[in-house]
């Protein structure tokens, strides 16, 4: 098997039995199971959900996206070796830690394979729940240009790049393009304030006003749990993005849960603790790949300027990145995962074949 064969780049063509179109995201693909298969698995596997809950198979890929584009490497390498397994392993670890600390559940019901989750259908909150402990990235870029109000929060004068903020800040943005909300542009990833959410909580997917407090509590509590665990391995949890949604429990009650992934190098910035104390920033997250791209291409404005999206898409499509750059990202992701979980990350030689075999033999979901 070649290195390219070990990468799962295309994850929306598995022969999983479904009666709905496969939903393909930047990294994961979702296969909604038939009602009959959902009910069968809930019964035979003993999932603790109502018997009529829709289930899905969520398959992660090794693709890497940055600046809203998918990048690829030399030698036909269409993704990062080990990336998908590393992301899932990290999320699985944090979700388990959340449960041990009495926080909310996640949407995951079963983990058949390192690349695969079986999840319950949730009603998503249309908010990217972003939490920041340090001033860097887009917040620093805005601050350095003189902006002091960020998502309705007034920042103090005198802050310096990459310093720890006086308090943990929640700086949400829109998830997807939302229309008809006063004061909120119909664009993806628009910064919003808590007052925006309060005034339009139902449009953002909240079932009741009090759940805004709950989502903020779950966001901050989850951040603190991960931050403490990362500090124990001398890593700095800088900022992150969580997602939330509602599910219905066996008693018919609606409850707020964590969705998607949490605390990964894709959804977070993680810095090396020793380097930070020495006044340096050593990225253990996708931010390192973003910085590589900005330095690799002669005109970094293409990657930053939303008005140049067609050029950016062509740049990503037409350029094979150096193999060493792709492998450096692989080492970052698998290294963080192994530190977090305390276990090596399995790298199957042919993940697609493995997934099909398990879903056929143990779940009877392959057609």
UniProtKB/Swiss-Prot annotation:
UniProt-listed CDD domains: SAICAR_synt_Sc
Pathway this chain belongs to: Purine metabolism; IMP biosynthesis via de novo pathway; 5-amino-1-(5-phospho-D-ribosyl)imidazole-4-carboxamide from 5-amino-1-(5-phospho-D-ribosyl)imidazole-4-carboxylate: step 1/2
Enzyme class: ligase
Enzyme Commission number(s): 6.3.2.6
Disulfide bonds: none
Keywords linked to the UniProt accession: ATP-binding, Ligase, Nucleotide-binding, Purine biosynthesis
Family assignment from sequence similarity: Belongs to the SAICAR synthetase family.
Naturally occurring in which organism (per UniProt): Shewanella baltica (strain OS223)
GO molecular function: ATP binding; phosphoribosylaminoimidazolesuccinocarboxamide synthase activity
Known catalytic reactions: 5-amino-1-(5-phospho-D-ribosyl)imidazole-4-carboxylate + L-aspartate + ATP = (2S)-2-[5-amino-1-(5-phospho-beta-D-ribosyl)imidazole-4-carboxamido]succinate + ADP + phosphate + 2 H(+)
Record GO biological process: 'de novo' IMP biosynthetic process
Coiled coil: none
Protein name, entry field: Phosphoribosylaminoimidazole-succinocarboxamide synthase
PROSITE patterns recorded: SAICAR_SYNTHETASE_1
GO cellular component: cytoplasm
């Amino acid at each position: 098997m070649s290195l390219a064969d070990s990468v799962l780049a295309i994850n929306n063509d598995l022969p999983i039995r479904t009666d709905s179109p496969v939903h393909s995201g930047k990294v994961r693909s979702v296969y909604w199971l038939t009602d009959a298969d959902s009910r069968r698995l809930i019964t035979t596997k003993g999932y603790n959900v109502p018997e009529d809950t829709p289930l899905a198979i969520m398959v992660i890929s090794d693709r890497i996206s940055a600046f809203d584009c998918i990048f690829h490497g030399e030698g036909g390498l269409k993704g990062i070796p080990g990336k998908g397994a590393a992301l899932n392993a990290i999320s699985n670890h944090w979700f388990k830690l959340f449960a041990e600390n009495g926080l909310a559940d996640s949407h995951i019901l079963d983990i058949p394979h390192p690349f695969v989750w079986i999840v319950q259908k949730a009603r998503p909150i249309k908010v990217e729940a972003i939490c920041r402990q340090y001033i860097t990235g887009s917040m620093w870029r805005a601050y350095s240009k003189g902006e002091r109000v960020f998502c309705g929060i007034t920042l103090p004068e005198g802050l310096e790049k990459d310093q720890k903020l006086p308090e943990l800040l929640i700086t949400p943005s829109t998830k997807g393009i939302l229309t008809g909300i006063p004061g909120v542009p119909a664009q993806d990833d628009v910064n919003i304030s808590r007052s925006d959410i309060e005034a339009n909580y139902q449009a953002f997917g909240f079932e009741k006003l009090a759940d805004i407090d709950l989502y903020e509590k779950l966001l901050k509590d989850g951040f603190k749990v991960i931050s403490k665990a990362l500090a124990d391995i001398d890593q700095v949890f800088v900022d992150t993005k969580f997602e939330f949604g509602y599910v219905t429990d066996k008693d018919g009650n609606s409850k707020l849960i964590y969705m998607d992934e949490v605390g990964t190098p894709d959804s977070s910035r993680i810095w090396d603790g020793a380097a930070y104390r020495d006044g340096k920033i050593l990225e253990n997250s996708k931010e390192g790949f973003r910085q590589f791209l900005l330095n690799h291409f002669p005109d970094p404005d293409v990657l930053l300027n939303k008005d140049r999206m067609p050029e950016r898409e062509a740049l990503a499509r037409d350029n094979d990145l150096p193999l060493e750059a792709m492998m450096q990202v692989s080492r970052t992701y698998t290294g963080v995962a192994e530190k977090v979980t305390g276990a090596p990350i399995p790298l199957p030689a042919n993940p697609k074949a493995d997934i099909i075999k398990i879903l056929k033999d143990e779940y009877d979901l392959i057609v």
